[in-house]
Amino acid sequence: MRGLKRININAYQKSMGELIDLSGVVDYNISHHPDAINIPYQRLMLYYDHYLDKNKSYYLTCHKGIHSAKAVTMLEYLGYDVTQAVT
């Protein structure tokens, strides 16, 4: 198994794929990257096939990096093109 794909969030550009902030709604409303959409971690993990397309690239972020690391690991195993975007 490969290592976790990771970039610094400052290197993210919209043309790379969709940036998803996995924070809860309250934390997202307090602070988030201007290009990020919010899909809370638990919701994405339950309904990933509803939100994600295996033919697209995604960059996942959260405030502490724990949820985004877990999500990238699981979703990559399931065949999605996902990268952790860290601060």
Question: Model-flagged regions — what are they?
Answer:
Residues 1-30:
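Flexible, polar/low-complexity N-terminal or interdomain linker segments that lie immediately upstream
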Residues 6, 19, 36-38, 82-84:
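Conserved beta-strand scaffold positions in the cores of enzyme catalytic domains, especially
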Residues 10-13, 46-54:
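Short amphipathic alpha-helix with an adjacent loop that forms part of the alpha/beta core around
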Residues 15, 32-34, 78:
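Short, structured coil segments at secondary-structure junctions
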Residues 21-23, 47, 67:
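Short, cationic motifs built from Arg/Lys/His that form the positively charged side of catalytic pockets
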Residues 29-30, 46, 69-73:
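Alpha-helical elements of the RecA-like P-loop NTPase motor core of helicases
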Residues 41-46, 86-87:
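Short, acidic/turn-prone active-site loops that include or flank metal/cofactor-
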Residues 51-87:
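Catalytic cysteine-centered active loop of the rhodanese-like fold, especially the PTP/DSP P-loop
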